[in-house]
Amino acid sequence: MCCPNYNSARALAQFLTERGLRMHKKWGQNFLLDPVLRTQLVKILAPERGERVWEIGAGIGAMTALLVQNSDFLTVFEIDRGFVQTLRKLFDAHVRVIEGDVLQQWHAAAAQEQPACVLGNLPYNIAARFIGNTIESGYIFKRMVVTVQKEIGLRMTALPAQKWYSYFSVLCQWQYEVRVIRNVAPVCFWPRPHVVSQALVLTKRNAVPSCVDPALFLHVTKTLFSARRKTVRNNLLTWQKRMPGGAAVCVEELCARAGIDARARAEQLSIYDFITLSDTLRALL
């Protein structure tokens, strides 16, 4: 089997029709037609010799065809069974294909392979969950190059006091340097999505902001963002009722020791503020 013309919507549609395949909206399937952008993304990923690369949502191989030329070891994840069979016919000698939901498969695969780099056009319904799950699990890739809906990209890069700043912003920027590569217009995809996308590169930080208890840091950060319009004080009081040993902590004293204004909201705090707050809390528990 030969690869189709990945630059042509008509050629891709014909390729699918001839093999009884079709696109599934529920999986957010959109193929990137722009050959210049495809090449740019692989160049930015820049895997080194001997490194394992993951591709998330390989489709019928537009990015895979480039990755096999630029990586020694490649694993692709694909949920669509028809596409899985196609990938195996096109690239079987060079690629490990894992069938299924990457959210369910990645942890076991990472334990086996220790991947360094990840590339993927991530659908809206899994983008934040996949990136968030890997970070929360302590698995940090050397580099990730992802294409996501622009809304997700804005959340990943947002800074304190900006509209899209959230727990997810803190989570991503805690472990990665996050940079926007470019916005990607709907016309660059087939089928055309109804939203603008964004390509980003996440590079593992050389010096990660350290905290005494990473799990507590994440828990405190998530708690403070759980009700965005509430103050730090009120969110901590809510947390206090649920946390074992929380009753022994004076919220006002905690904020004072951490140098945090108890009247502030989570969206006003920096990563270092959350770390200071969680470290101070750990000392008081």
UniProtKB/Swiss-Prot annotation:
* A Pfam short name: RrnaAD
Provide the residue positions that the database annotates as binding S-adenosyl-L-methionine.
N30, L32, G57, E78, D101, N121
In this UniProt entry, which cysteines form S-S bonds?
A: none
Give the main location.
cytoplasm
Function recorded in the entry: Specifically dimethylates two adjacent adenosines (A1518 and A1519) in the loop of a conserved hairpin near the 3'-end of 16S rRNA in the 30S particle. May play a critical role in biogenesis of 30S subunits.
What reaction(s) does this enzyme catalyze? Answer: adenosine(1518)/adenosine(1519) in 16S rRNA + 4 S-adenosyl-L-methionine = N(6)-dimethyladenosine(1518)/N(6)-dimethyladenosine(1519) in 16S rRNA + 4 S-adenosyl-L-homocysteine + 4 H(+)
Gene Ontology cellular-component terms for this entry are: cytosol
Q: What is this enzyme's class at the first EC digit? A: transferase
Stored PANTHER family? DIMETHYLADENOSINE TRANSFERASE, DIMETHYLADENOSINE TRANSFERASE-RELATED
Location(s), subcellular: Cytoplasm
The family classification in the record reads: Belongs to the class I-like SAM-binding methyltransferase superfamily. rRNA adenine N(6)-methyltransferase family. RsmA subfamily.
Q: Which domain of life is it from?
A: Bacteria
Q: Which UniProt keywords apply?
A: Cytoplasm, Methyltransferase, RNA-binding, rRNA processing, S-adenosyl-L-methionine, Transferase
> Which PROSITE patterns does the annotation name?
RRNA_A_DIMETH, SAM_RNA_A_N6_MT
What Enzyme Commission number(s) appear in the record?
2.1.1.182
Question: SUPFAM superfamilies attached here?
Answer: S-adenosyl-L-methionine-dependent methyltransferases
Single GO term (MF): RNA binding
The protein's name is Ribosomal RNA small subunit methyltransferase A
